[in-house]
Amino acid sequence: MIDYTVFKDKKAVYYTLGCKLNFSETATIERRLQEAGIRTAKRGEKADICIINSCAVTQEAEKKCRQAIHKLVRQNPGAYVVVTGCYAQLSAEKLSRELGVDVVLGIDKKGEVLEHLGNLVKHSDGGEWYAQPAKDVRNFVHSCSRGDRTRYFLKVQDGCDYFCTYCTIPFARGRSRNPHVSELVAQAQMAAAEGGKEIVITGVNIGDFGKSTGESFLSLVQALDGVEGISRYRISSIEPNLITDEIIEYVAGSRAFMPHFHIPLQAGSDEVLKLMHRRYDTSFFAQKIARVRELLPDAFIGVDVIVGTRGESEELFDKAYEFIKGLDISQLHVFSYSERPGTQALKIDGAVPPAEKHRRSQLLIALSEEKRIAFYERYIGKEAVVLFEKPRSGMPMGGFTSNYIRVETPQNAESVNRLVRVRLGGFNEDKSALIADEIIGFAE
């Protein structure tokens, strides 16, 4: 039984590390606490409750989590501190001993933050922790964040059964699981009722959707496409072996699914892909990109790449660079390999020095910018429909075209959360966006 009177006049602050899924889950936690009467603290206000949603994909992410705990404890003396997320799952007992931490919640308890706030009495002798082994977790914690009420993030799947050699996510998130399509359609309908226009479909391995319910990712896409009021959907990230021709073909003819794919490659040589235990080779990946381009020539295609994994010699990196350079893609998300305890990758010979990882990373980041700018340049002078978002104070108003080109224009309150037809001009000062040369009118 929750005593809601304890939360009267209380304020909370939230700190999130990691992926879009984590941000979605934090927003859901925040929403639940607000419904219980806990206000989100404004900038500079002292909070009574601190919620940290952690990440464990790299050593740096874990370090940032510990730094965030120390900073929030220092800035909010006496606040009740809760840590959840992937790092909390993997190192619950360790985190419970961090100065100021009251409760650490593993993945199975992530949806129960409110229940674990108790009477907000701090623990003087160290924090409590609740985390069962990820392999035993079967529950699915729903999440649909509304953010700025323009773009929603809908969690459709959790966990992963792939066990790539470099990755701790299966140990932090558990086995692949999902709710029924009908439940997710209901959440999309709620987002539409609140005025949402765009939904980003998120998860850990969303193409694996359906294992828990006997459904499929394609059936989910088809059902969501029929939700009235949602003008746009984006597929956040999908494994190359799970993005079937049927999915690509459906998106190509879809009412609301945008020509935008994010497909993780992770390594550009067959030798390293094999060391990683990925489920495809470079030939398969290239064919998949070509198929997307054939059916959706204007699609924005983002690709994840990890540099400096064990076993990636300089020769293999050069081979990977040339392969990636030849792909007709729009942008790269580049990550430096981080050694994670308990992973099979630690058994592989050929560790890459940090300086060499950095060099390789910078080469691919530069290649990514070349590809993104070249993609943007194709659309200068053309008309496009942009969904504009609420601007930050003093900043231009920004939004995205259907194929994920960032567009900026002077602030105009009437255009916020509206689909607006514009004529695309040249680049802004730092080339991060195109300027809307002309506002043609609303496209809805």
Language-model segment annotations:
Residues 81-82, 90-91, 95, 193-315:
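Conserved SAM/AdoMet-binding glycine-rich loop
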Residues 312, 327-329:
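Contiguous mid-protein beta-loop-alpha structural module that forms a pocket-lining wall or clamp
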Residues 147-150, 160-161, 257, 267, ...:
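Short flexible coil/turn linkers enriched for glycine and charged/polar residues
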